[in-house]
């Protein structure tokens, strides 16, 4: 990290007059920002100045900007230019030799990169203790420090920053560089508001942990990186999404977890939790970043086109073109956090396109919405609203609109206090009806004050009869779904003052005759009509027609209103006005309500009742309730018992006497006994009172129980006598156990298999009273009765079970489980079945809630004990109970994480694991699922390990390998072992010691579906410690990995495992890889075939570990100088991804460096022209690497020409003593290259490669050794001139790097990649011992 962790100082401090004096540090502190001066003393101590490095003579180190595990970052001043830079010091002690050389090579390449959104690498200087990387200085620190000091970022600012980050990231990806460590601390800012990516490429290598463990902090890491599948450009996109969450929330995802649990969650979860308050655009952006499959993750180029990023750039383009300045960014962050902390709902700025005042106005608008208006008169606006939601007009004959068809005011219909019982306040009196029937259409003024209401629709101009006003719209019989559409014309007509009389209204056609059930509602109102006799005649004739068809004045129902009016083409428009007026003359039903019960002289005929054939009753729908009585009456009449014959002497009870049996004396006695019994039981029940003496209550309860046992039919007597409540009242206060026992038996007998009585008992509060007797303080007999009651509650109906649980029944069930199985087996089994029934309940309550309640009582501990006892028994019942216990365990493993943590007790797990082998196969698989689900939570892994889960599961896997259910068992076991061993070396070694390796190898060879579960465990074994690798050696693990190279899905993982193993035990692994005594394909052939047949994604991913492996082991690299490999590499040299082209060039370079012909291989295998084309590649790093290969080829050709003309070459006259060679760190003169290269300490150019005829013992002595300190097996006969303490370095690295980097310690001059001026002195090369070797 190059940033200042907690300061915002402006500009570099003025240089001290005397370099190296403490005054400079004090002055820099005085010139720092107030934010820094307010820091406590402890922080200022941390930011101490660096110890002067003699090799950094052109720089003066200042205060510390940040510290990490491998070093610190200091601000420094360049004495020559006055430029302020950042110097990252890395301790060499913490770096492996191979990593140091890689870093120095990479820095020399990365310093060529230049983009406004990445931090510039300026070079490096190597000292005896540290490697000093010189970087561009960003004065305003990182986004992490801004968030730490000022709070969370608003979305628009995050979008603006992410736009710049994506531009920098896109540039790096186009250059073939993977950042690997994107987070807020590695995104630095400048005063101009620019953000720059830091710590990409090389610097990220220095933040990792040793022993091939997971690199860096886990919270930003992609799942494929955690699983050691290799980092790609898609891994940076995942980290970018985590950085967005970090800036929005102030913390990265899973920040509340420890690193290892966080790694576990990243791999297992579908995606990290998204911020709750994020906008949909941000959530969509994050979901694009968090695609689990790296192949489906979008690229940086596509993310730049995301709407959120585009809008952020567009909003920024409104202001001047330059980026957001630092002060403005800080101000916006402060305002945003103040808004988050403020109690009111208003916002400081207008969010997107929402109304800025909307949030503030909503609380004020809310009360007015529910405030009732003081004036009940409908306003013009309210009339439109109410009309829109009016009920559809009734279309029966009993139509109120027909009664008001002339001049009634619609506003009167809206009055809530008018009731039909009082004729609507007099509006429907006979006087009013006379006025409605008059021709002038005027309305008499009401005495009740109804004339105060204005009626804008009472007098509407129109073309039709002036007597008509508002009419109901005639509906077609289409059903209820068209009701709203049928009422629209009427409403529209009222709004536009257009009469609706043009709509044809057909005559009424009732569905059924009702003349038998009502008085004739047609009366003569001729005295009400003034002068028009013709109209009266027409009205009367119309009523006559209607009466002939029958009319219906039944109470209208909503389901019939729409179908009353039926359109008929037989009636034209001319008949409609008269029909309207005729209908309106009728009296409303409310006016004759009382008269319908009066007899009608014409209704003396009872033929309809007697069921005469000539009269057909059309039973109305509303009379369905009288079906039984009507049918019974007709059946009686059909028997002619009293009406069919007029003879008065006939006995009306003749039929009754015929049906009587003979007098049965025994039946009479039984009835008498039952009557006496009923009286006795009712007397006993009435005596059950809490005020009775306990002795009396005891006698009563015993008598009642005796009677009930002798005659179970007395159950109904007790219920009818309301005996349940007295029994519950006595049970609530009684303490005599004999009374309690008797009453409990009575209750259980009454409620047995009768869910209605059970529900009634629950409703009156019987459950908590009886549950009390399940406690252990009561004797066994009482507890058994209480248990029988509990059993009835949970197995009869869902409702009783729900009420049982709500009354605290779960605690009762747990208490049953805790009893001794030997003594109280029935109680224990009732508890097991009860808990199973609770989980089997299909109700609205989530099972997770039951799990949480039961986990507080540690229910799985007694359940595991019960499981052990049940497995000792045989029979169907034992198997059922075993299955139910296994299902209960499985349900607990599906609950929330808190429940899993509570149930993952060591004693429970140990007991369950021990009983696994004894369980039946089906239930065994269920219990294995329970263990697997627990293993998916990182906090339970220690408990599983302490319960010997790995040992037990491995043994179970071995014992079931030949059984029919092996596939299901191994599926669960392998998942569990994988979850436990992943990212944990101790558990990996534990599994290896228990013999998991040969089992997994056998599964991989035989079981294809299980191969996907076994291979991850096997490949992770190479990353474990010495114990795991020893088991791999014992089971030919290296040969197994080589065989995996032929699998396109696992070749990348296998090659990464081989490379990791080679790092840990270099000499031994290298020897086996070079040995071709294996019967199968050699390692080199496997790699060549892998590169030849691999698909696009696999080919890209395999290049990274392959180039690392070849760079680490030159002897292995030398075996790859094959024409078939170079042909394949040449086909891919023009790949569209820069990272692929760069890795291919690195592989070719490693092979050339390790071979005798070196750069000559390019011309030999026809790659020279293709690499010459790459010298013009758009990617800077590719161009630079191609140029170095071309120069290597030129040097090789030049050397071969010199070798053909030995007379032209002068032999060396002096040699370098071995002691001097072992201690030097740099040549005495800056220039170290021979063929007119730029004279620099280290500029990444290829040093001269010296051909060697073979890998001699002295060459092997220079190769890197293992991390465990073992040397190569071929180094026994080394010459004494090499020195025993000399570090083993690879020959390829020795050829590629200058002599500056060959030795670990330097005392004379530092190695550096910084450019220096050419020396004006004559260039002379110091002769070396190697020169004398090959020159002679």
From Swiss-Prot:
EC category: transferase
Compositionally biased region (Basic residues): 1315-1327
Binding site for ATP: 65-73, 88
Location of the active site: 181 (proton acceptor)
One Gene Ontology cellular component: cytoplasm
One GO term of the biological process aspect: cell division
Protein kinase domain sequence ranges: 59-309
Keyword Coiled coil annotated: yes
Ranges of biased composition (kind: Basic and acidic residues): 36-46, 384-393, 1194-1205
Recorded superkingdom: Eukaryota
Keywords: ATP-binding, Cell cycle, Cell division, Coiled coil, Kinase, Magnesium, Metal-binding, Nucleotide-binding, Serine/threonine-protein kinase, Transferase
Stored SUPFAM superfamilies: ARM repeat (SSF48371), Protein kinase-like (PK-like) (SSF56112)
Biased composition (Low complexity): 1-10, 1253-1264, 1272-1285
Keyword Oxidoreductase applies: no
E.C. no: 2.7.11.1
Coiled-coil segments: 654-682
Protein's job: Required for early events during cytokinesis including localization of cytoskeletal components to the cytokinetic ring.
Family membership: Belongs to the protein kinase superfamily. Ser/Thr protein kinase family. CDC7 subfamily.
Protein name: Cytokinesis protein sepH
């Amino acid at each position: 990290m190059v940033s200042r962790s907690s300061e915002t100082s402006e500009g570099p401090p003025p240089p001290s007059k005397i370099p190296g004096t403490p005054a400079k540090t004090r002055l820099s502190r005085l010139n720092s920002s107030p934010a820094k001066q307010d820091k406590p003393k402890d922080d200022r101590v941390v930011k101490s100045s660096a110890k002067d490095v003699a090799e950094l003579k052109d720089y003066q180190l200042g205060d510390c900007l940040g510290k990490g595990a491998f070093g610190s970052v200091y601000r420094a001043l360049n004495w020559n230019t006055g430029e302020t830079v950042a110097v990252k010091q890395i301790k060499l002690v913490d770096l492996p030799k191979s990593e140091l050389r890689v870093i120095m090579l990479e820095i020399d390449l990365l310093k060529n990169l230049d983009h406004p959104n990445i931090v510039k690498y300026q070079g490096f200087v190597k000292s005896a203790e540290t490697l000093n990387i010189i970087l561009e200085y960003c004065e305003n620190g990182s986004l992490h420090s801004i968030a730490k000091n000022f709070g969370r970022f608003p979305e628009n600012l995050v979008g603006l920053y992410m736009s710049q980050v994506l531009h920098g990231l896109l540039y790096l990806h186009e250059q073939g560089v993977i950042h690997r460590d994107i987070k807020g601390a590695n995104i630095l800012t400048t005063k101009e508001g620019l953000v720059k990516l830091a710590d990409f490429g090389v610097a990220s290598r220095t933040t990792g942990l040793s022993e091939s463990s997971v690199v860096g902090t886990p919270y930003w890491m992609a799942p494929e990186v955690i699983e050691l599948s290799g980092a790609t450009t898609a891994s940076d996109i995942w980290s970018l999404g985590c950085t967005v969450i970090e800036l929005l929330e102030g913390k990265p995802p899973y920040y509340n977890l420890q690193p290892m649990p966080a790694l576990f969650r990243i791999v297992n979860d579908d995606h990290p939790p998204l911020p709750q308050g994020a906008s949909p655009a941000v959530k969509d952006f994050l979901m694009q970043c968090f695609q689990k499959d790296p192949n489906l993750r979008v690229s940086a180029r596509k993310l730049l086109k995301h709407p959120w990023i585009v809008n952020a750039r567009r909003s920024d383009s409104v202001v001047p073109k330059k980026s957001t300045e630092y002060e403005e960014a800080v101000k916006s962050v402060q305002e945003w956090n103040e808004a988050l902390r403020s109690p009111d709902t208003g916002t400081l700025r207008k969010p997107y396109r929402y109304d800025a005042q909307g949030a503030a106005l909503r609380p004020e608008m809310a009360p007015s919405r529910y405030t009732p208006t003081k004036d009940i008169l409908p306003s013009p606006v309210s009339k439109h609203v109410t009309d829109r939601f009016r009920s559809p007009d009734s279309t029966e004959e009993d139509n109120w609109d027909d009664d008001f068809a002339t001049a009634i005011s619609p506003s009167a219909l809206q009055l809530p206090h008018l009731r039909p019982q009082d004729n609507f306040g007099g509006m429907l009196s006979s006087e009013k009806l006379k006025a409605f029937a008059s021709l002038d259409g005027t309305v008499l003024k009401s005495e009740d004050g109804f004339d105060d209401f204005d009626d804008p629709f009472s007098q509407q101009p129109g073309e039709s009869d002036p007597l008509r006003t508002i009419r109901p719209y005639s509906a077609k019989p289409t059903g209820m779904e068209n009701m709203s559409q049928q009422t629209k014309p009427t409403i529209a007509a009222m709004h536009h003052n257009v009469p609706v009389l043009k709509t044809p209204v057909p005559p009424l056609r009732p569905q059924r005759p009702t003349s038998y059930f009502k008085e004739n509602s047609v009366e003569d109102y001729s005295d009400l009509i003034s002068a028009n006799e013709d109209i009266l005649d027409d009205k009367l004739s119309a009523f006559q027609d209607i009466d002939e068809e029958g009319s219906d004045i039944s109470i209208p129902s909503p389901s019939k209103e729409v179908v009353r009016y039926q359109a008929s083409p037989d009636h034209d428009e001319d008949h409609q006005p008269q029909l309207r007026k005729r209908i309106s003359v009728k009296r409303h039903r409310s006016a004759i309500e009382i008269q319908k019960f009066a007899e009608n002289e014409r209704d003396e005929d009872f033929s309809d009742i007697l069921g005469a054939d000539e009269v057909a009753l059309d039973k109305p729908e509303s009379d369905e309730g009288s079906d039984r009585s009507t049918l019974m009456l007709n059946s009686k009449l059909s028997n002619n018992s009293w009406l069919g014959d007029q003879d008065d002497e006939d006995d009306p009870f003749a039929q009754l006497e015929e049906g009587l049996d003979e007098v049965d004396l025994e039946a009479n006695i039984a009835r008498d006994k039952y009557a006496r019994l009923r009286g006795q039981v009712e007397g006993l029940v009435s005596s059950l009172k809490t005020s009775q003496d306990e002795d009396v209550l005891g006698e009563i309860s015993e008598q009642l129980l005796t009677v009930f046992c002798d005659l179970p039919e007395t159950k109904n007597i007790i219920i009818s006598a309301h005996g349940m409540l007295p029994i519950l009242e006595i049970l609530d206060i009684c303490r005599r156990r004999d009374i309690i026992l008797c009453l409990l038996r009575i209750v259980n007998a009454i409620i047995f298999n009768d869910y209605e009585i059970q529900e009634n008992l629950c409703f009156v509060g019987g459950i908590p009273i009886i549950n009390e007797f399940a406690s252990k303080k009561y004797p066994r007999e009482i507890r058994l009765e209480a248990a029988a009651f509990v059993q009835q509650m949970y197995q009869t109906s869902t409702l009783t079970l729900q009420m049982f649980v709500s009354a605290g029944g779960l605690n009762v069930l747990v208490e049953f489980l805790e009893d001794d199985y030997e003594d109280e087996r029935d109680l224990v089994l009732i508890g097991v079945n009860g808990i199973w029934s609770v989980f089997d309940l299909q109700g609205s309550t989530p099972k997770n809630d039951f799990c949480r309640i039961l986990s507080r009582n540690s229910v799985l501990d007694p359940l595991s004990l019960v499981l052990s006892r049940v497995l000792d028994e045989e029979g169907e019942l034992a198997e059922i109970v075993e299955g139910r216990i296994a299902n209960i365990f499985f349900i607990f493993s599906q609950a929330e994480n808190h429940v899993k943590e509570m149930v993952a007790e060591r004693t429970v797990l140990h007991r369950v694991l021990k009983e696994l082998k004894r369980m039946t196969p089906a239930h065994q698989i269920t219990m294995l699922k329970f263990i697997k689900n627990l293993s998916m939570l990182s906090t339970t892994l220690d408990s599983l390990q302490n319960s010997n889960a790995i040992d037990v599961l491995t043994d179970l896997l071995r014992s079931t390998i030949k059984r029919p259910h092996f596939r299901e068992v191994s599926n669960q076991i392998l998942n569990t072992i994988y979850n436990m061993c992943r990212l944990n070396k101790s558990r990996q070694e534990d599994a290896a010691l228990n013999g998991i390796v040969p089992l997994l190898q056998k599964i991989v060879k035989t079981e294809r579906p299980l191969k996907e579960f076994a291979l991850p465990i096997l490949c992770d074994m190479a990353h474990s410690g010495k114990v795991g690798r020893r088991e791999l050696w014992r089971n030919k693990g290296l040969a197994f990995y080589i065989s995996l190279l032929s699998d396109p899905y696992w070749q990348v993982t296998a090659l990464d495992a081989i490379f990791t193993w080679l790092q840990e035990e270099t000499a031994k692994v290298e020897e086996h890889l070079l040995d071709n005594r294996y019967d199968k394909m050699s390692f080199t052939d496997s790699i060549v075939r892998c590169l030849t047949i691999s698909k696009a994604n696999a080919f890209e991913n395999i290049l990274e570990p392959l180039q690392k492996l070849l760079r680490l082991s030159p002897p292995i690299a030398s075996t790859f100088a094959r024409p078939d490999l170079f042909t394949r590499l040449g086909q891919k040299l023009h790949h569209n991804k820069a990272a692929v082209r760069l890795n291919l060039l690195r592989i070719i370079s490693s092979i050339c460096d390790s071979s005798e012909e070196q750069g000559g291989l390019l011309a030999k295998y026809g790659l020279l022209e293709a690499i010459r084309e790459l010298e013009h590649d758009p990617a800077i790093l590719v161009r630079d690497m191609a140029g170095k290969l071309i120069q290597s080829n030129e040097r090789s050709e030049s050397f071969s020409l010199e070798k053909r003309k030995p007379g032209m070459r002068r032999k060396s006259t002096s040699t370098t003593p071995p002691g001097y060679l072992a201690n030097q760190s740099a040549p005495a003169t800056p220039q170290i290259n021979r063929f007119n290269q730029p004279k620099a300490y280290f500029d990444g150019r290829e040093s001269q490669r010296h051909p060697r005829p073979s890998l001699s013992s002295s060459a092997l002595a220079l190769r890197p050794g293992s991390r465990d300190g073992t040397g190569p097996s071929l180094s026994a006969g080394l010459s004494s001139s090499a020195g025993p303490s000399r570090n083993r370095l690879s020959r390829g690295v020795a050829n590629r790097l200058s002599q500056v980097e060959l030795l670990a310690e330097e005392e004379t001059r530092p190695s550096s990649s910084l450019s220096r001026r050419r020396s004006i002195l004559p260039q002379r090369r110091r002769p070396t011992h190697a020169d004398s070797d090959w020159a002679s």
